[in-house]
Amino acid sequence: MEEKKCYLAGKMSGLTFDEMNGWRTDLIPKLKEIASVKDCKIKIINPVDYYNFKNPTHKREEEVEDFDLQQVLSSQLMVIKLKGFDTSPGTIIEYCKGSMKNDLVILGLGTKEEEENLHPWLKRYIRRIENDEDKLCDYIRDYVLI
C-alpha cells in the first residue's frame, strides 16, 4: 500500500491555539477517510503537533524552520489555509520552497474573497482552491490519491 504525506500549511503567528489548529483538526479525519476509501495510507503533518506557541519546545527559530521545511519537501501534498497566508512569512516560505518540488501538489482552502484578494504570485503554484473542506477532499480523492 502506497503512503502519501500531506503537510497542512497555514498561519500560526498571532493566532490563538484554536485558530491555528482548529481547521487542521477538522480536516485530518476527512483526509484519513478518503485515504482509506482509496486504499492508500496517508501521513498527515500538522505542524502545530510539533511546534506551537502554546507549548514551546524549540530552542531556536531555525530549528522550527528546518523541521517544517523538511516536512514540506518530503510531502506529496500540501494544503494551505488561505486566511492569513499573505501575512505569514513562514507559510509563504513553505509555499515557495514546496513549489520548486515537481511532485508536490499544492491546494488551497479558503473563502472566495480570500482567493480573490490573494496576490497572483501567491496563487501561481496552487493547483486548485476550494472554499469547502468536503469539496477539497473530493478533489484530493479523485485527482491526488490516484
Q: Each predicted region: which residue ranges?
A:
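Conserved catalytic or regulatory cores that recognize and/or transform ribose-phosphate-containing ligands
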Residues: M1-I146
